[in-house]
Amino acid sequence: MKVALPKGVFDIFPYITDAKHMWRHTSLWHRVEDVIHDVCGLYGFSEIRTPVFEKSEVFLHVGEQSDIVKKEMYTFLDKKGRSLTLRPEGTAPIVRSFIDNSMNQRDDNKFYYILPMFRYERQQSGRYRQHHQFGVEAIGVRHPLRDAEILALLWHFYSAVGLQHMQVQLNFLGGEVTRKRYDKILREYFLDHLSSLSLLSKERFNTNLLRILDSKEPEDQEIIQSAPPILDYVSDDDRKYFDEILSALDALNIAYDINPRLVRGLDYYTDLVFEAITTCRDHSYALGGGGRYDGLIASSGGPATPACGFGIGLERVIQTLLAQGNFTPLSSHKLRLIPVESQADSFCFVWAQHLRSLGIPTEVDWTHKKLKNALKIADAEKATFVCPVGERELVSEQLTVKNMSLRQEFSGSKQEVEQRLLYEIQNTSL
């Protein structure tokens, strides 16, 4: 029986040629990940890696009424009956690590991660049961300009990777004073419309009132649009804090829109919440989001510590880049040696190792196909340079390298070819 992938997961590999699955090409993922490392380094963030699975209670602080905890977690018992869960989101494990490793001894902790997440989600476009997320978490400082800096990093990443038509949507949920005031107003409003709400929103009315604003159910939309906006009820301190964030974004020319219905899907958010929205082919959708979560660390058993961060789904980022037409796979290797005859094998083996030591990515074609066929394969596999080696090259000590991209070639001694290859690789944008 043929083995096959489970539903909701996929392979990332370098030999994809059809447009539909091009987003799974290894080189595209490498390019996005390289941008992440570079941009996060510019802002002083360091990479953190947490285990694929955690004790299940780590994720209960995400919110027992959230969709993740209620129906999307991959939870299992180990051989000793302990409940463990595959990581469904990035923030809770980093909070656990922060507490476990006593990182509160530092005033300011800035992390980023690129990690797989696991959620048992309904099959739909852009949603996968294993997906990959880039996120940042800044723990220890509460300041409106720190929040603006997080948004600037988000915007910088989108610009650097090449995404177009981006906008950030913002809302401010406020602190304890604001939330208590607004909860009372919102409860009275939804109580008047309770009979018309969806079953899910009726459930949220008793468990997590604010999440009704996040409902996607058709029967809720008109009621939600008429709901009183939270920004009408924020305290003076909250309004001042939010205004300072907006002024900072204006100073950086970051495009934003205030969305008074935005609440996010996880229960731990306080104060600032945001989503990054793109428009592609007349369709708008979120590519990531986040906000401030000043109460999560204390509720997880750590010291009261402010924090802010975001998460971005990389599958949608790469798919959107391809849809916007400015993203193509990179060549998978720079130079391919083709020993035309078996007596050239040893030469190619030794020279390839020397070329690699010089920093020239090199592959050897050991299939001994006819040269015409070997060149076709090299072209199909996006080799940038090809160098056939046979008896003539060994005797004359003159080598010819074909530039497959430019359809040009150059010749010379081994040392001359090495210098030309180094120059070409350093000065060619692929």
UniProtKB/Swiss-Prot annotation:
Q: Which NCBIfam families match?
A: hisS
Q: Which Pfam families match?
A: HGTP_anticodon (PF03129), tRNA-synt_His (PF13393)
Write the Enzyme Commission number(s) for this entry: 6.1.1.21
Listed InterPro entries: aa-tRNA-synth_II, aa-tRNA-synth_II/BPL/LPL, Anticodon-bd, Anticodon-bd_dom_sf, His-tRNA-ligase, HisRS-like_core, HisRS/HisZ
- Protein's recorded name: Histidine--tRNA ligase
Q: Which family does it belong to?
A: Belongs to the class-II aminoacyl-tRNA synthetase family.
Write out the annotated subcellular location: Cytoplasm
Listed under catalytic activity are:
tRNA(His) + L-histidine + ATP = L-histidyl-tRNA(His) + AMP + diphosphate + H(+)
Record text on subunit structure and interactions: Homodimer.
Question: What are the protein's UniProt keywords?
Answer: Aminoacyl-tRNA synthetase, ATP-binding, Cytoplasm, Ligase, Nucleotide-binding, Protein biosynthesis
